[in-house]
Regions:
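Non-catalytic substrate-recognition and accessory regions of acyl/acetyltransferase enzymes
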Residues: 1-144
Length: 144
């Protein structure tokens, strides 16, 4: 995939129905082809953990690659939500986990497009659960 096409992945996000937008805690959902995805920004002590999940029947869910064929609109929607969150909340630290190595490139692109321009620097750390991105605000004044 060429780089221009790669960046266009971000251009068509779906609308998110936000159930909670309270301070640093945001929770919402969006649907693609009758499948529901949840997105959550869990904020504690200046650190925000980001997760998104394909909801399955009987409350089973999947945080990994789901094989639904919807990865492009899912990623575009999540990436734009991260951009909106950083713009409005500007947490000191934002973290998320790439459980599959194939997702690392996508997450780097998301950070470079939506988080780095807001004054964050990021690292990638190996954990027992996957690779964790940790983006740290350079300074409180770097927000805009």
């Amino acid at each position: 995939m060429n780089f221009k096409l790669f960046l266009e992945l971000f251009d068509n996000p779906l609308p998110i129905q936000w159930q909670i937008k309270s301070g640093g805690h945001w929770a919402g959902s969006f649907k693609i082809n009758r499948k529901e995805y949840d997105i959550d920004f869990d904020h504690h002590d200046g650190v925000t953990d980001v997760s998104f999940t394909l909801m399955k029947p009987k409350s089973l869910s999947s945080h990994g690659i789901t094989g639904t064929g919807d990865e492009i609109p899912v990623f575009a929607t999540v990436a734009n939500a991260v951009g909106e969150y950083v713009e409005k909340v500007y947490p000191r630290i934002i973290k998320f986990l790439a459980k599959e190595p194939s997702r690392v490139r996508l997450y780097r692109a998301m950070l470079d497009r939506y988080v780095k321009p807001k004054g964050y620097r990021y690292t990638l750390e190996d954990t027992m659960f996957g690779q964790e991105f940790v983006a740290i605000a350079s300074s409180p004044l770097a927000k805009r």
